[in-house]
């Protein structure tokens, strides 16, 4: 069973911590992950630094810039996760942008995720209609594709996302009124 599915098998609240790989220095990722877990993190997202992180806010954009200046690479991130896996079974997801995965090749990326025991992959810029094969290939390796929905996502699209996603769907909240939660929570399928 995928560790993400196992984690979310209970209804308790979960603490998911995001860490940009290679920030504040190239070799700090492992220590930051292990300290986050000691501090109570139930799951870790490791951000893959990218030169144009348009879906991220200014803090993560700056962390990406520093990590890239530090010289972190996707291959090094996989090696760091392998080292982390020697010390913990906490679920780990990679979060990034599709361009570095395309450059590596999707099959090679998925193989490296599997080899490093990555549990999930989040790619906010991968268009849903272009993600079917990629998501299915992830699921074939027991890796959860983690897809996103927003308050303005249509019912039809939510159903498509829930069928394609793995064991977790991200609900992006917009700062609107009435409560963003009320705008979409009632529309989410009870099980994906």
Task: List each model region and its residues.
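Conserved, mostly hydrophobic/aromatic
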Residues: 47, 113, 161
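Catalytic beta/alpha-barrel core
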Residues: 119-130, 144-151
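Glycine-rich, proline-tolerant flexible connector loops at the mouths of alpha/beta enzymes
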Residues: 45-72
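Anionic-ligand binding region
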Residues: 151-168
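N-terminal amphipathic alpha-helix/helix-capping segment at the start of soluble metabolic enzymes
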Residues: 1-16
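Active-site mouth loops of central-metabolism enzymes
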Residues: 16-27, 93-104, 148-152
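Active-site beta->alpha loop and helix N-cap motifs at the rims of alpha/beta catalytic domains
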Residues: 64-122
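Conserved small/polar residues in nucleotide/adenosyl-binding loops
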Residues: 175-180
């Amino acid at each position: 069973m995928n560790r993400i599915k196992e984690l979310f098998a209970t209804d308790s609240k979960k603490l998911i911590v995001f860490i940009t790989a290679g920030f504040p220095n190239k070799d700090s990722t492992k220590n930051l992950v292990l300290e986050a877990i000691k501090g109570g993190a139930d799951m870790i997202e490791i951000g893959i630094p990218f030169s144009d992180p348009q879906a991220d806010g200014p803090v993560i954009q700056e962390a990406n810039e520093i990590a890239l200046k530090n010289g972190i690479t996707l291959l090094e991130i996989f090696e760091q996760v392998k080292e982390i896996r020697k010390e913990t079974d906490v679920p780990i997801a990679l979060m990034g942008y599709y361009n570095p995965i395309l450059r590596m090749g999707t099959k090679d990326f998925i193989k490296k995720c599997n080899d490093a025991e990555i549990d999930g992959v989040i790619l906010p810029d991968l268009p849903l209609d272009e993600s079917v094969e990629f998501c299915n290939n992830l699921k074939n390796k027991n890796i959860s594709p983690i897809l996103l929905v927003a308050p303005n996502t249509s019912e039809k699209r939510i159903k498509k996302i829930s069928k394609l996603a793995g064991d977790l769907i991200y609900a992006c909240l917009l700062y609107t009124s009435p409560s963003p939660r009320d705008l979409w929570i009632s529309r989410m399928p009870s099980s994906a």
